[in-house]
Curated annotation (Swiss-Prot):
InterPro entries: Mitochondrial_Carrier (IPR050567), Mitochondrial_sb/sol_carrier (IPR018108), Mt_carrier_dom_sf (IPR023395). The keyword Chaperone does not apply. Its main location: mitochondrion. This is Mitochondrial glycine transporter YMC1. GO terms for molecular function: glycine transmembrane transporter activity; organic acid transmembrane transporter activity.
Amino acid sequence: MSEEFPSPQLIDDLEEHPQHDNARVVKDLLAGTAGGIAQVLVGQPFDTTKVRLQTSSTPTTAMEVVRKLLANEGPRGFYKGTLTPLIGVGACVSLQFGVNEAMKRFFHHRNADMSSTLSLPQYYACGVTGGIVNSFLASPIEHVRIRLQTQTGSGTNAEFKGPLECIKKLRHNKALLRGLTPTILREGHGCGTYFLVYEALIANQMNKRRGLERKDIPAWKLCIFGALSGTALWLMVYPLDVIKSVMQTDNLQKPKFGNSISSVAKTLYANGGIGAFFKGFGPTMLRAAPANGATFATFELAMRLLG
């Protein structure tokens, strides 16, 4: 199998844009924001179920979590803490896609004298860079979201009255960036896989029909490619996400699982074996396809509208 694919920019050929094109960067970021909002609206119920499964202290199932959530909190419980990811994930996806596209332009211009294509390792490197940069924004946002998602009280009985109070308490306990290391590892390798798979699928589609342009690929195919890319991402990094979630729901003053990946992993394995690293895997995989299909389709369609 060839290691090189056509190097398609989102809408136009990469050659048409200089490496430092501010207008292109703004469009990338705006389209990424739209994709992130779509991801949250589609995926939030699955994500809430996943987080509660990952952090449950007793064995349970996805259906049991859903049943209890509906009984105790109603349908709105699935969207608890949504404001934070709606704003935050929009920013995170915007950053992921923006950096990924900037790196694609960087490699394209670097390769100009040798080849007009990007290699598979270069596509992977683009995604890794976007993921690592995004980690520093995603980690605190996810920490706040997870704290809000997992608190069972409401109103005056809630530990956190909202995102701002949650941020204040996390900062007071010097814990806002707890879980940053597993987030960097998850986002780096995960986004590398994510964008590599997507670009490979896009390139394969363009190779099948001579003269086909990226902007001519229908939305339903973009959804399928995004769904497959999102599924590949989570297959690669899921145990790291469990470790991160456990770290971010642990006691703020005296974390019983410890503050490192190794200490959390040892405790999880001691308490639940290998299965402990895959709690919530079902809802995550159910979420991966529609949420990431919506992300990529919205992203590309937004880019077409922006021109």
